[in-house]
Amino acid sequence: MNTFGNIFKLTSFGESHGTAIGGVIDGCPAGIVLDMEFVQGELDKRRPGQSELTTSRNESDKVEFLSGIYEGKTIGTPIGFIVWNNNQHSSDYDSLKNVFRPSHADYTYFQKYRHYDHRGGGRSSARETIARVVAGAIAKLILQKKGIKITAYVSQVGDICLSKSYIQVDFSNIEKTAVRCPDLEIAKQMIALIQSVRLRGDTVGGVITCICHGVPVGLGNPVFGKLSAALSNAMMSINATKGFDYGMGFNGIHRKGSEANDLYYRNKDGKIVTKSNYSGGIQGGISSGEDIYFRVAFKPVATLLQGQLTVDKDGNEIQLEVKGRHDPCVLPRAVPIVESMAAMTILDYYLYNY
Amino acid sequence: MNTFGNIFKLTSFGESHGTAIGGVIDGCPAGIVLDMEFVQGELDKRRPGQSELTTSRNESDKVEFLSGIYEGKTIGTPIGFIVWNNNQHSSDYDSLKNVFRPSHADYTYFQKYRHYDHRGGGRSSARETIARVVAGAIAKLILQKKGIKITAYVSQVGDICLSKSYIQVDFSNIEKTAVRCPDLEIAKQMIALIQSVRLRGDTVGGVITCICHGVPVGLGNPVFGKLSAALSNAMMSINATKGFDYGMGFNGIHRKGSEANDLYYRNKDGKIVTKSNYSGGIQGGISSGEDIYFRVAFKPVATLLQGQLTVDKDGNEIQLEVKGRHDPCVLPRAVPIVESMAAMTILDYYLYNY
Amino acid sequence: MNTFGNIFKLTSFGESHGTAIGGVIDGCPAGIVLDMEFVQGELDKRRPGQSELTTSRNESDKVEFLSGIYEGKTIGTPIGFIVWNNNQHSSDYDSLKNVFRPSHADYTYFQKYRHYDHRGGGRSSARETIARVVAGAIAKLILQKKGIKITAYVSQVGDICLSKSYIQVDFSNIEKTAVRCPDLEIAKQMIALIQSVRLRGDTVGGVITCICHGVPVGLGNPVFGKLSAALSNAMMSINATKGFDYGMGFNGIHRKGSEANDLYYRNKDGKIVTKSNYSGGIQGGISSGEDIYFRVAFKPVATLLQGQLTVDKDGNEIQLEVKGRHDPCVLPRAVPIVESMAAMTILDYYLYNY
Amino acid sequence: MNTFGNIFKLTSFGESHGTAIGGVIDGCPAGIVLDMEFVQGELDKRRPGQSELTTSRNESDKVEFLSGIYEGKTIGTPIGFIVWNNNQHSSDYDSLKNVFRPSHADYTYFQKYRHYDHRGGGRSSARETIARVVAGAIAKLILQKKGIKITAYVSQVGDICLSKSYIQVDFSNIEKTAVRCPDLEIAKQMIALIQSVRLRGDTVGGVITCICHGVPVGLGNPVFGKLSAALSNAMMSINATKGFDYGMGFNGIHRKGSEANDLYYRNKDGKIVTKSNYSGGIQGGISSGEDIYFRVAFKPVATLLQGQLTVDKDGNEIQLEVKGRHDPCVLPRAVPIVESMAAMTILDYYLYNY
């Protein structure tokens, strides 16, 4: 399905080689000043070809708002927006018309849809994320007014891992390198790895860490409305994701309960807080007021510039050589998408309560 | 919220110390023979006190169906069912009336609900899973008829890890030990660890692995209806979960793309299959026909039989001693819950297509 | 489907000849005092056999709450409730096992469900309304605290019509007669008509009028979330309904626009109000603060104590004689159901805003 | 809210004086040939200024598809479409910036939205129906392939009423006059009435009748998923509607049950059919296979070219004179909208079953 959210809802449309990508945001509160520069800036962050690490596609996507805004503010009606598709090299994909690319969605799509658009991955392509980032930017603007800040960064590429806690990391460094890792030493190593992988025509995966700061207590519902489940659903809807964990996550299994509890105490201001935050800001599915932090694992992207053996629709084996422009590592580009999905999810739950 | 699913929908109700736990299943196809023994058997699997590993609560929950069934078959109308609450020791919890148990949902619930039921964790308690297991059992019955089999087992407890691929594991061993690990050697080590942790009044977490075999190709939708996102949402809705990954998951980050692609070929029967299954049976959010396998991480349970420092509603520090009956490790009991959530999710997507 | 509402949600279950009828209410705010007498009283109002007009079924339905309530107040968790089925004469229906009753749902159900429960109409029976009335009673309690009052009454039976505006009617008279018409003269005529129809073994239909007083301005959304559409959907979900209109409705067609506009003016208290209320309290799909009033048309009930020619499942013509206990006119019994559906709808929209 | 449907879903956006009107259709099956001429033709039918009866606004709306279509067929992905707004006279509305037009949505909108777009009624304007008609056209194309035909016509204007049953009416006459009434004699009278009303600067309402032919048995669900409830919800979502009834509707109250039952018999082909169709093709909320027929009542449009007394935002009384271009009767233009809503509803339920 193509709609995300319950109250703040994004319905997206558009194939990467169709006429336009776009979306409709329903449930956006009225009276929000729309900072167009900020929205366009977020969209620019996701573009490939913005650094030496990524491909040269150099898409300059300008978002156009068609409704829902009057005199610079939202009016509470659905916000329709589009980004025209240009600069898409359809011919790069012509050799792929009848071929199933390994680990791509082609085979599953063919089985499902029969008549489908083979060009550029149709709706499984990363260009579909444009709509997410536009809606996410608007969500961020609204959350910022409530003192809620969403920050994501690359914390692992292949075997290169930033193992420090987010508390010890300087967020202002994130945008200083193309790889969006806030530890400049580790960032260098990551860049070197990506370059070498690229030269070999291979790809590499990694992990993005995200922190949601200032989320008030009480968002989420026990049982089936857990905020942790909603965040995992949001992250796992991003292309190329393979895993999600929050708080101590998969690594926390090595701790005993006595080593992993967040003990309550009353602080200097008389407020009830916890000494630690192993839970990652969510207890029993409901936000606790502490920082929410989680990780998203991304697989190595499946388009290789190496040759690969595969089959076409009739089952004949063929050697696949893909020309064109592809990424050795999607992690840096995925950072704004993770932030967008987090912003939309948090806002959706926020509006449910307030 | 308290409803799970889009077509095969479970709405659950009931607090652990209220009158009854129950649910309503809507969207169950008509004409399914309801194997009552099987359903009751699944419910028995989740019971504590069934082995030396778990607590002595010894709840014998008998499910009672109130509607939706006629002459032993489903009739397509909503299936209402209840399990009466007995054998709940309310007095065990009386010392907790005004106290926030560390890493429990108490504090977040108090902030959210004001007037809430402190006894036994209300709806955040594991007893709420009764409804999930009943609905999951019915879902399994329906899937079995379509040749779809769901199997889960404990693959990690603390540092003890069953690292073999599921392909090399013998499922018939799962129920042979209390810890539900199919490798009997590893199972022994797990049991020893749990016993020692229990004696110290501490708790330990772990990982459950789940395989969905025989899922046809085409379930799921790209963008926001990905089957991977739905499964993660379902698993993360279970109490005490901290993470989800599928296919090569978090561990796959160490592979390059060239080492992680599932290459297509035509097999002896002329069918198009893959040589490997790093994707875990889901490509681009849609099932590929291969086995779907995923992991769910559980944190160490938060109720300790050790004393702990905490605060009460007025912020006064108090020493918490919890009497009663608690689990050092919830993993074995969570296995039928993971299977239930998987069955309901797969069935929901199955009914969407067929 | 078996769920009604978006925020205040009722999921109902139960066949009239099954074990129990019941429901789960999700989204009920916490802290509401549950006036059990009031709820049981509303349920008693819908019972047949409470007057000389209706049949002698004499069902005494006692509602039992299973969850969601602690120390007499709602706790914000789902409220599960049941009413056990007794006093249902299954044998009255044995002659109907393979026969399609004219204008009943039998034929359509058979075509749809294959294996279905023929006894007493299964889920198409009026007993399914028990769940609606319980949830409606709770909704009324919540609305009353906000100064919102829902009142319905019978305004037409066959050709006997109460044509006065609701403004000129005395609501305290509604419960004074079995027919629930607030004009005692007209009520007498209605009763006489129903008696004569009953003696002939025939049935008659009518109209119920409903007023929602004190609904604040702003409930509803333009386009697809119109409060008028929601109310019509709610009313048309009641068995035997054939039509809905509000404000001047179908009769207003005879007016010109100049005769039908509600002109604004500022009243003595300085508040902006309208001189008239042809719109029926809803403008552009949003409540205006004025009384919402609407009508629901009910067809004559389809079970006749006269013989009727029909066919069985094999298409053979047979003469249908129905024994048992049936109503010549369902209008009086439908009054609490109309109020319940109105209360649930208004509350659902109220909670969306506040 | 701005989304209609459960499976075949339309999300619409756009204010009449904004940049564009548009929508996204999700859930459209793949492989449907999109007859662009037919879609544009349906859109042309709703335009004002196409006859001497309506206003001279002369909007020529051309729909543009942005996604979801490849080589002329739908591909199963969301279909995004827009219609650019031009030819909207903003200045006609400048006198209205702070004034509440009687029986318009202005007052309720102001109360609800604070900051809203006063020009042309924003989203409460009839231009929003563009999206409905585009989606409805596509729905009709799909239904036609299944042998399902939707036909609507004007059956009443003011006191002029076409009282014949739809069975005796010649549908080929509908488009022969501007008023879209299939009885040419009655049509003349209706046109005369509308002209005279227009000269007086007044407005008049009426009724549209709609027939859905060829709907298979089994669409709809008892309880809350009744097809009759869904149709009423769809119709009542149209601007200016005041009532809905189907089958014998409000007029059927005058019949006794014995005079209103549809008796079953086996016809020459051995098929089980009914002798009559008082039920209007829906029994117990489920389609019976017979023609579904219903009526929708429209109030006289609220914009008058006569002066009217009203208040502005500060409560000061002012005399309202509206310049511009307005309709004395919206009924003819509403015919394609009624058909669109019926088509979308029937298709939604059809896809649920098949």
From Swiss-Prot, chains A, B, C, D:
Swiss-Prot/TrEMBL GO biological process terms: amino acid biosynthetic process; aromatic amino acid family biosynthetic process; chorismate biosynthetic process
Membrane-spanning parts: none
Cofactor-binding details, from the entry: Reduced FMN (FMNH(2)).
Keywords carried by this UniProt record: Amino-acid biosynthesis, Aromatic amino acid biosynthesis, FAD, Flavoprotein, FMN, Lyase, NADP
Pathway annotation from the record: Metabolic intermediate biosynthesis; chorismate biosynthesis; chorismate from D-erythrose 4-phosphate and phosphoenolpyruvate: step 7/7
A molecular-function term among this protein's GO annotations: chorismate synthase activity
Enzyme class: lyase
Reactions accelerated catalytically: 5-O-(1-carboxyvinyl)-3-phosphoshikimate = chorismate + phosphate
Cofactor: FMNH2
Assigned GO CC terms: cytosol
Name used for this protein in its record: Chorismate synthase
Taxonomic lineage of the native organism: Bacteria, Pseudomonadati, Bacteroidota, Bacteroidia, Bacteroidales
Gene from which the chain derives: aroC
